[in-house]
Amino acid sequence: MKKVTAMLFSMAVGLNAVSMAAKAKASEEQETDVLLIGGGIMSATLGTYLRELEPEWSMTMVERLEGVAQESSNGWNNAGTGHSALMELNYTPQNADGSISIEKAVAINEAFQISRQFWAHQVERGVLRTPRSFINTVPHMSFVWGEDNVNFLRARYAALQQSSLFRGMRYSEDHAQIKEWAPLVMEGRDPQQKVAATRTEIGTDVNYGEITRQLIASLQKKSNFSLQLSSEVRALKRNDDNSWTVTVADLKNGTAQNIRAKFVFIGAGGAALKLLQESGIPEAKDYAGFPVGGQFLVSENPDVVNHHLAKVYGKASVGAPPMSVPHIDTRVLDGKRVVLFGPFATFSTKFLKNGSLWDLMSSTTTSNVMPMMHVGLDNFDLVKYLVSQVMLSEEDRFEALKEYYPQAKKEDWRLWQAGQRVQIIKRDADKGGVLRLGTEVVSDQQGTIAALLGASPGASTAAPIMLNLLEKVFGDRVSSPQWQATLKAIVPSYGRKLNGDVAATERELQYTSEVLGLKYDKPQAADSTPKPQLKPQLVQKEVADIAL
């Protein structure tokens, strides 16, 4: 009897040990179809697409901070602009013959229309709620002074009238008219100063953090979606079947687990480069990153806030990168209006606002150090600009503000440190390395891992960027009738251009404006503002662009 009891006891212990081992393994390794690294707007947007396209796929999102949308997607860490080239002068460069190129502006505007359609669709599905909580109508204006700049803006306005996307834009050189549009900018200004402005009523202010939170909250309603906060990726390893084993550390209790994923998206903002390098895919060797931060002056004084309802962008100074141009913006943050002015560039070796001072050094490798050196040597003007920005005093920043708000008072403003942006440096066969404006989707040949690098125009074009990723990584599925039908339901204009089609442009703007609660009046015929004869430009070295 004792032998039987002992044998049963041994079997029980053995079975219990097997059970415990199985549980330990389960806790150590989790399986998922899609792993989203980073709790920002890019991961949230991709997850939302995939939820409609493949509702049965399991998804896991990991975020190193204690909440989602706390880095670059956070409303206070970016300019909150719905970038559509209505006012951003860097998207319409002047050619050597003096003409204005609008190709980039058209592309940026087309991209933002996709974002508007994506958000409108999510509102109709109940994924996004209360549109005013994340998007509001704020007119977009360009404002310049000086004869050459006025001539440029007049020519830009005339050139943009060739596109159906920019109908409704108005132009004026009249002080009284511009004061009506933006009183804060004009009051106290020299009445003899030569000025010009354009204004488009359908501009927007967007809280990308709120969009991110709402998208992820909707994803969490499904049992096959898991969100893990305070979770940092420590390693990525490709398996023999082309899946990935990703080691994730719990920053609260120090434990680690492995997540086995069929597809991995690295949407970790500034940290994406280091994680892409960690993956070991050969495509990562072509890239390096350079971090640039931004500061804004902020006013919450009702006397200032209630006197300004516009986003007003100027023209970059000679020698400064185009995206460095100051702008004075109406924002809607935390449910109330504020006014921001900036940005002022800052420098830190961190790749994230909540990153490590070792980020830049640890991302430097034998394969990307030379491209970084070439970019530094070839963009000395940019280096000088960044140094000059870092050296700015409080008085310097206030004087810059007064160029756009002549009657500004120091006591109405405080300085705010916004997010970090990691600019793309890419290996180039001719130049060794080039600084790239924009974003790039980098993926392996097998389509099992992809990362988003870059900073501008960023969040405002999350929907088209993730659409591009789907086409690049899931090409066969995208071409299937099922995915085509779903994508066209999400983005009605998918697969065709709005530019040049007045009826289609007006139809989409009307639809998205109604759903998102935005102002939209059918544009009238453009005015007869004459196009000036611009002088040919001296051939100059192109100034590298950056995003702040």
Curated annotation (Swiss-Prot):
GO biological process terms, semicolon-separated: tricarboxylic acid cycle
SUPFAM superfamilies, per database record: FAD/NAD(P)-binding domain (SSF51905)
Pathway: Carbohydrate metabolism; tricarboxylic acid cycle; oxaloacetate from (S)-malate (quinone route): step 1/1
Keyword line: FAD, Flavoprotein, Oxidoreductase, Tricarboxylic acid cycle
Reaction catalysis annotation: (S)-malate + a quinone = a quinol + oxaloacetate
Required cofactor names: FAD
A GO molecular-function descriptor: L-malate dehydrogenase (quinone) activity
EC number: 1.1.5.4
Domain of life per record: Bacteria
Signal peptide: none
Family: Belongs to the MQO family.
Protein name in UniProt: Probable malate:quinone oxidoreductase
